[in-house]
Amino acid sequence: MKLTVLGCNGPYPEAGGACSGYLLEAGDTRVLLDCGAGTLAALTARMAPEQLSAVVLSHLHYDHMSDMLPLIYRMQGKGKLPVYAPGTPAEMRGLLAGAFDLRDLEHAEHIGALTLSVLPVRHPVPCYAVRYTAEGKSFCYTGDTNTCEGLTAWARDCDLLLADACFTDAQWAENKPHLSARLAARMARDAGVRRLVLTHFTPGTDQHELLFQAREVYPQALLAHPGLELEF
């Protein structure tokens, strides 16, 4: 498998950056995971979007799906791209209806060479963590979540964990919609994952502090950045 980070900001992109978007490749299968602002340009620099096997949207917040709207124009006359997304919010899902082969993420099991395992997580709108497996390798993406029952077990022994790490210790609270870097690292350690990449950085947050706090728990933690490529 290969993961390419296209964007890693939220809820809006920093100068020169992009919101959540990741390209996962396994053999001939290519899946775009989330499609926030700036993601489409980064994707198009690497491949034609019509070469995608599917798009998987962890949830329907703008910073994870806004570039689906210009993608509608890019895909005109090129067939309906399969898009897996939660069923709600209905008004957000409705923006995609008709333009794509829209499918329920809740029931997704296979995309090409990839087998999917979906877990509902804790966020203000329905959001799903997804584990992708192919040829004995596994990749886990938390989507957006705070602490969540079952998340550590879901990520157990994966080869690469891409985890929401929006907050420093000082910023995090139990009632907020995202994990801290330290909590993401603790989950990675307890799950026995082989590699951890932190993502979903708010512009202006000290990413060095995020990495420092994560590495106190999981010393090999990495920060996502546009253009980062990892093979596993």
Language model segments and positions:
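Active-site metal-binding loops of divalent metal-dependent hydrolases
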Residues: 8-9, 35-38, 60, 121-123, ...
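Cap/insert and terminal regions of metallo-dependent hydrolase folds
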Residues: 148-229
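Metallo-beta-lactamase
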Residues: 80-127, 134-136
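Short, surface-exposed connector motifs at secondary-structure boundaries
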Residues: 27, 52, 75-79, 135-137, ...
